[in-house]
């Protein structure tokens, strides 16, 4: 049975899910900090086995990002990602201040654009411009 659990900050689950979808590996310290600084974490389970997760990060007043939306390959195309994103969006709506608006953004993993368009996340427009990303690396001296 598919269930959703909120605010479980389990580094081993996070790192395992990232590894199962082939994402860049993180140190345990990075992963713990990422989880600790998330506004909301929702983990998806099939019975007691973690099969996905998603996080909301941001300032909680003006801008939030959907981050690390993961469903492991053998559970993709079963609408689990849609159920997860519905819960993440509902959370952002619940924290949006009355008579204001929250900007909800994401960086879409390559090949997942069609899924994200379902949720009205489109490509760059003349009004909004493209999303950009820069990775910052600091080497130990």
Residue ranges and their predicted role:
Residues 1-28:
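Short amphipathic alpha-helix that is part of the acyltransferase structural core
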Residues 36-54:
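Conserved beta-hairpin
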Residues 63-73, 77, 130-133:
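Conserved acetyl-CoA binding element of GNAT-fold acetyltransferases
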Residues 96-130, 134:
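Conserved active-site alpha-helix within GNAT-family acetyltransferase domains
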Residues 71, 77-92:
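Conserved acetyl-CoA-binding loop-helix of GNAT-fold acetyltransferases
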Residues 6, 67, 107-108:
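Small/polar loops that bind or transfer phosphate-bearing groups
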């Amino acid at each position: 049975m598919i269930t959703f659990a909120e605010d479980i900050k389990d580094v081993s689950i996070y790192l395992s899910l990232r590894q199962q979808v082939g994402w860049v590996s993180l140190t345990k310290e990075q992963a713990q900090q990422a989880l600790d600084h998330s506004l909301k974490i929702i983990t998806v389970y099939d019975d007691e086995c973690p099969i996905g997760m998603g996080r909301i990060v941001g300032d909680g007043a003006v801008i939030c990002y959907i981050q690390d939306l993961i469903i492991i390959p053998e559970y993709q195309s079963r609408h689990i990602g849609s159920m997860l994103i519905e819960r993440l969006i509902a959370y952002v709506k619940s924290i949006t201040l009355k008579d204001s608006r929250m900007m909800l953004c994401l960086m879409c993993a390559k090949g997942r654009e069609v899924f994200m368009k379902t949720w009205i996340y489109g490509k760059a427009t003349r009004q909004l411009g493209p999303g950009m990303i820069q990775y910052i690396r600091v080497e130990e001296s």
